Amino acid sequence: MGPHPAVAAIRLAVRRVLHDILIEHAPGSADLPRDVPHDLPPPPLVLVACSGGADSMALASALAFEAPKLGIRAGGITVDHGLQSGSDLRADEVVGRLVDLGLTPTESIAVTVGRDGGPEAAARDARYAALDAAARRHGACAVLLGHTRDDQAETVLLGLARGSGIRSLSGMAAVSGTGGRYRRPFLQLDRQTARKACMAQSLPVWDDPHNADPAYTRSRLRHEGLPALEKALGKGVVEALARTAQLSRDDADALDVWAGQAEASVRDAAGLLECAKLYALPPAVRRRILRRAAIEAGAPAGSLFARHIEEVDRLITGWRGQGAINLPGKVVAQRQGGRLVIRQG
């Protein structure tokens, strides 16, 4: 008798991702002559980020099951945000569960959560910084994240509410981070599948009270917004939003390529952006070039919003002699003699 359908589903999702990782990190010894001695590198290490919740515990269990069969080392990391009383003890419990699954290395990392961008964004920034550092420290080639299709739907709605562009509507990528470090195997699986997999394997899970706290935007969306949409529109809203994310990502990727190819054609010999040539481009392509130029000048990508780029765009499409535009990171955009100059102020 095979595993529970939910367990089979999570294992298959992880197996596919691990196969991709193996292909990407295969040792380059195949081209060496057989009579030339050479040392093979150690098997790749894949870490799972685990909060102890159902999604990440299911992911950890699937990684622990699949990795040895593929000759991959598997470890686990939990991040203690220190936002709740006893969080350090819970983090230690999670590490114990990861050890019980057979994962090694395992580690609990305590972080200090700042205030920039609100509590959710600050916690996310601290968490990813800790995971990046852990991956470098342990020499991991990838870190698995337990985001599900439900998380993807929530992300799309949050982007829509902010009035963001198509890139925000594309949600979370299956592969992201420097060098493709972060992998999200569960983006095609719903949250209930992960929870059922934990139940079928008798895995203890921890339900973070913050996930039910209406003080947090994502929590309100999860417990009030999405149920209201499904009540008004019928079942299938989550699936439709996740599908929208993928279609939007395909379009956004194509526009990014177009913008990258067009950028060289709108710069003069000195590398400055020519306003007349920018004006001739489609708005979606032009704004991507402007955003890229602002980031290259030092504007933090996470603080550079659509409204900032729209203001810079008006220097090209609605020129009336207006002054310089101040952007995040002390970057200034200014039109000078038919050229657009974006630089540190």
UniProtKB/Swiss-Prot annotation:
Superkingdom per UniProt: Bacteria
Keyword Nucleotide-binding: yes
Record-linked Gene3D superfamilies: 1.20.59.20, HUPs
UniProt xrefs under InterPro entries: Rossmann-like_a/b/a_fold (IPR014729), TilS/TtcA_N (IPR011063), tRNA_Ile_lys_synt (IPR012094), tRNA_Ile_lys_synt_N (IPR012795), tRNA_Ile_lys_synt_subst-bd (IPR015262)
SUPFAM superfamilies named among the record's database cross-references: Adenine nucleotide alpha hydrolases-like, MesJ substrate recognition domain-like
EC code(s) of this entry: 6.3.4.19
Pfam families linked: ATP_bind_3, TilS
Catalytic function, reaction form: cytidine(34) in tRNA(Ile2) + L-lysine + ATP = lysidine(34) in tRNA(Ile2) + AMP + diphosphate + H(+)
Keywords associated with the record: ATP-binding, Cytoplasm, Ligase, Nucleotide-binding, tRNA processing
A GO cellular-component term linked to this record: cytoplasm
CDD domains to which the protein is assigned, alphabetical: TilS_N
One of the protein's GO biological processes: tRNA modification
Segments passing through the bilayer: none
Coiled coil, from the record: none
GO molecular function, one term: tRNA(Ile)-lysidine synthase activity
Location of the protein in the cell: Cytoplasm
Residues binding ATP: S51, G52, G53, A54, D55, S56
Domain notes: The N-terminal region contains the highly conserved SGGXDS motif, predicted to be a P-loop motif involved in ATP binding.
Function: Ligates lysine onto the cytidine present at position 34 of the AUA codon-specific tRNA(Ile) that contains the anticodon CAU, in an ATP-dependent manner. Cytidine is converted to lysidine, thus changing the amino acid specificity of the tRNA from methionine to isoleucine.
Stated family: Belongs to the tRNA(Ile)-lysidine synthase family.
Full protein name: tRNA(Ile)-lysidine synthase
Organism: Streptomyces avermitilis (strain ATCC 31267 / DSM 46492 / JCM 5070 / NBRC 14893 / NCIMB 12804 / NRRL 8165 / MA-4680)
